[in-house]
Every structure is written in C-alpha cells, then in structure tokens.
C-alpha cells in the first residue's frame, strides 16, 4: 500500500494497453465539449463553513446510453474482482483480446468486466467494498460495452485486512475531496491513506485569525477509522456516531436549502455544483446532463460534507465572482489519455488548479464530467 505511483506505473498500474498518452503545450485549443458559456450559477447555498453554487444549464446531452457503477453492480451487469491468474485486455486495434498473466491479487489493481450493452462511466473516488480490501476508483474513465475483463486502477482505503472473497459491491459512497484529489491528481497510495486517516489535506494549515477548529479533528477521524476493529476502513467515517452525526446535520441543511434554491427552474436544469469552504472556492463537479448529476448528487453531497466538518471553520464566504472565476477554462500544460472510439481524458494544470475532463467518443462526442480542483498539496 505504500508503493509510489511511479513504481506502480512501471509494474503496470496504468495497464490498459489501449490508452494513448500525450502532453500538449500550454494554450492548446480546447477540445469539443460543453461551451463554458452554457452554464449559469444560481445564488449560493450555505451552512456553516460549506457553500455551494448550483450550476444550471438550459441545454443538456442525452446521457441515457451510459451506465453508472452503482447501476451496473446492483444489476449484475458489471463485475469487479480481485486480480487473478489471468486477465484479458483489448489491444489498441480493439481486436481479439490478449491474455496477460498475473501472479495474484494486487493492492492497486482489480479486474472489471462490463457485461452491459451500455458503456460504463467510472468516477475517481467511487468506493467498491469487499474483496480483500475496500478500494476506490483511481481515475475517471469509460469502459466499453460487452467488454472483456480489464485491469482497473484503484487505491486502497482499508488497512489491516487482506482476506475474504474476491468480488466487490458498490458502497454508494464517493470519498471526500481530499481523498479524491490524492487519488485523481497526486496518484500516490500513501497520500490517499493519509487523507483517509487525517480527514482533510488542509486541516493542519496554519490557523487563520478568523478560523475556528474543525468540527471533527484529524485525531478524532483517525480514531474513528481505527478504533474497536481489526481493520481500518474509510466506511467507518460514515458509520460512526462521532463523525457521521456531524455529517448528517450538514447534509440535511444543505439539501433543504439546495432544493429551495433550485425549485421552480424554468427551461434550466441543475448539472453541477461549485463548492467553497469558508472564503475558498475549492472544488466543482459538472456533468453533461441533469440526469447524470442526479445519479451522483447524494453521494457527492455527503462527500463535500465530510470535507466540511474536517476543515477549519471560517467566517468568510466565497462570492459568485469567485465561483465564476473558478470555472474559467485553464490555460496550462495538458496531459491527455485516450482509448480509441471510447473516451478521452485530459488534465490541465495552472497556478494551483487542476481541471479534469472526461469526453465520451461514442455514441456522440460529449464531455460527460468536468472536475476542477484547487490543489491542496
């Protein structure tokens, strides 16, 4: 669990042979997707140190052709298993799959099969429970329909167990932003686990004059994860009375205010949110359709709330101008990966911000998910 991303890269963590990998220079033209001007921010919804700006759009894509991980696992159309003796992967030409032999289960790689007739959407930070350890998806991607078993990059969020079955279930959980950032951007197992046990990447920042201590300290979260059990698991954060009750309160208040703010929309639908903690705009998740946003909303809201209770409480509130500036298209170095005919993933980094976009290439070119992160490490 303590191997670095670069060590794992050498041993095949990113082992999908169909992936292409390129670097683009700063200022390269934007790829097709939803125009930046097609979004509008509503008035912010706030509770304590958490503020959300609903993102609405008057147009949206038809995303009914895509399957979510929760749907796929619950219906038996998707299987996730520990890595076994042999895995089949497609080559770049999408020809007959080639066998690859493995010695056995791996902490940072599982095997996923999409049996469905629909392409499968995966988001970084989605948690799958079971197997020998609970894991989270390492990176946004799309898995083609009727596929063969593929290696799936993951990070461990459970320590102290390496036993039990080989199959996984969907935990209906997306880990909170500090953990998602370390998975999707830093891509280091040690950083992921540090965020699991420490709560927030910013919890230990030097205190600002207006900052109050977090509602739940890093020590309390660490104790919650480790206490009274043989294993240390991320899911205990959600299940514990100490952390869970604080999170439940934030979720209930934000949900009530969010519904009130977004009710009565005419000709527009909510497709995402911009998230701020105190006066700092920190995160945004925006989708190609309101249906996709709705599919992930409850899990995302809970993840934002976990981050909120783990961060210092600040009196300042982010402004709408701050949120709009956060959504501007970045102009920095661009890293791109693609699987021909299936998806394109790209990350642009500029001045402490990272923007990640996942484009579907079939059945129609569209940006399914757009993530913007203010990096904390």
What are these regions (language model features)?
Residues 14-18:
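Secretory N-termini
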Residues 19-120, 125-377:
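Intrinsically disordered, low-complexity segments enriched in small/polar residues
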